[in-house]
Amino acid sequence: MAKRTAEVERTTGETAVRVWVDLDGEGAAELDCGVPFFEHMLAQVARHGGVDLRVQAKGDTWIDDHHTVEDVGIALGQALARAWGDKAGLTRYGHAYVPLDEALSRAVLDLSGRPGLVYNAELPRAHVGRFDTELVEEFFRALTSHAAMTAHLDVLRGRNAHHMVECLFKAFGRALRQAVSTDERAGGRVPSTKGAL
């Protein structure tokens, strides 16, 4: 099997981002975004997704973290799409439920070629530490748009905002791991009756 890796660089007047991903990794992460809680969440995606991930980002965080988080989502989405290529032989779909103490989240993914995000999370706090919890949705919207994937992401219950967000990122990682896995029964075919995704 060919290596399923990709690197994307994105530079704007607001950020400079470099993302490298290996879909067949061991869950290792090297993260330097200047947004500590976000780095903690990206590490969950890598570890529980079984992907190796390197992210370097410098942004205008003196304003707020929005541009950095969104642009990392854009670059990561583009890197994922490049890494999985035409999706021949992939499982395509993935789903996971992940608990963290009192919190429970669900992620359901389709590497459909059609971008879409359905996001439901009623978080009890506007911030976890300094991190604005509105940016969770912004990150996943950017990622799904640029990966051309459909994602249904739901925080089903919880009281602690940190737990709720963290188990959502873990669930996304677990679902991604399943979706990008090789389907031995597919015979290398694209997982669609259309023959293309």
Curated annotation (Swiss-Prot):
It is found in: Cytoplasm. Pfam families: IGPD. The gene is hisB. Signal peptide: none annotated. It catalyses: D-erythro-1-(imidazol-4-yl)glycerol 3-phosphate = 3-(imidazol-4-yl)-2-oxopropyl phosphate + H2O. Keywords: Amino-acid biosynthesis, Cytoplasm, Histidine biosynthesis, Lyase. The lineage of its organism: Bacteria, Pseudomonadati, Pseudomonadota, Gammaproteobacteria, Chromatiales. CDD domains: IGPD. One of its GO terms (cellular component) is cytoplasm. Belongs to the imidazoleglycerol-phosphate dehydratase family. InterPro entries: IGPD_sf, ImidazoleglycerolP_deHydtase, ImidazoleglycerP_deHydtase_CS, Ribosomal_Su5_D2-typ_SF. Pathway: Amino-acid biosynthesis; L-histidine biosynthesis; L-histidine from 5-phospho-alpha-D-ribose 1-diphosphate: step 6/9. GO terms for molecular function: imidazoleglycerol-phosphate dehydratase activity. This is Imidazoleglycerol-phosphate dehydratase. The keyword Metal-binding does not apply. One of its GO terms (biological process) is L-histidine biosynthetic process. Its EC number is 4.2.1.19.
